[in-house]
Each structure stands twice: as C-alpha cells, then as structure tokens.
Regions:
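Nuclease and nuclease-like effector domains acting on nucleic acids or nucleotide cofactors
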Residues: 1-147, 152-181
C-alpha cells in the first residue's frame, strides 16, 4: 500500500525541463504493460541557421499574387530577401518569421505590393493578411494571415530554416496542401 516505504528522489535532482521521455506504469493487475513515451521538441522552437538561396523575381512580378500564393505550391522567398537572411541564427522559427517580414518591409518594391494596413503590419514584423479569397474558414476559426509552408514537411526531414524549402501560401492553400491533396 506504500505507507511504510519511503521514496528517495534522485540526486542530483534533474532539471524538470530536461524531461522529454516517460514510462507510463498502469495499476497492478490491469494487465496493461508499461509504455515508453518520448516527447519530441517542436523543431520550430529550436534554434537554427538560415540556409538556401531563394528565387530571383522577374522585373514587375507581384510576389504574393493570388495566382501564385493561392494555387500550386505557393510563392518562393525572393533571392534578395534570402541573401539578407542567409547565415543568420534564430532562436525560434517565430523569430525567423518576424525577420523575414521585416526584410520585406525594407524592400520598396515588395512593400508597395501590399495594402496600407498590411504595410503597417509588415513594418512591425507581423505577417501580412491574405486577401479574403485566400482565407481559410475552418469549423472553429478563420485563418487570415499568409502562412510559411515547408515544402518537405519537417516531420519528414524538411529543414526548418532552409529558405529553398519554404513557400508563402494563403491559409486556404495551406489547408489544401496539408489536408486535401
């Protein structure tokens, strides 16, 4: 019953944030064997260095035109934006996302392609909102902001910070790529 047994904690006591695996033990007599569980850290929350070259934009090309960002595989990261990010280390993918949009805000040709409301967002490092036709209307919420899609999914070995693995897509296309193809 455990009333006459003392449990001694391990020494030194491990830092709780280092625990990422467990053994689940079920009650005696339940017939269920212990299960080993490993909780993997989300790679987007891990640091990384930006790689990749992006794609040169043809003169006069609208980067996030709906025909690109709402169809196919989305819009690639422009090469001149990739050049500014390549080699930089970020603590998380969220920090990378912010830096990407801030670099876009510094490019007069790219920033001019956005509405004034989106320009304000982008200059703050926030993601631009997609046009209404590109939004995803889910059962619980409406996703309005452009998404950064990993062409080769992270779970299948796709690099988190490789610009050549990234595409900017509308929420609608992102949903289609992940759940309807």
């Amino acid at each position: 019953d455990g009333t006459d047994t003392y449990t001694t904690p391990p020494f030194p006591v491990p830092d709780p944030k280092e625990f990422n695996d467990y053994i689940l033990v079920f009650p005696a007599g339940s017939g269920i064997k212990p299960i080993y569980v490993y909780l993997k850290e989300d790679p987007r929350k891990l640091p990384g260095v930006v790689t990749g070259h992006g794609v040169p934009l043809s003169p006069g090309t609208r980067w996030l035109d709906m025909s690109i960002s709402n169809n196919g595989n989305g819009a690639p990261i422009p090469a001149h934006i990739a050049d500014k990010l390549r080699g930089r280390e970020f603590k998380t993918f969220d920090e990378f996302r912010e830096a990407l949009w801030l670099e876009v805000s510094q490019d007069p040709e790219l920033i001019a392609q956005f509405s004034s409301g989106n320009q304000t967002r982008i200059k703050q490092g926030l993601t631009a909102k997609a046009p209404i036709d590109g939004r995803h209307y889910g059962p619980k919420d409406i996703v309005k902001k452009f998404q950064i899609h990993h062409r080769v999914a992270i779970e299948y070995g796709g690099s988190v910070y490789d610009i050549d693995n990234l595409r900017i897509v509308t929420p609608r296309l992102h949903d289609e790529i992940h759940y309807r193809r």
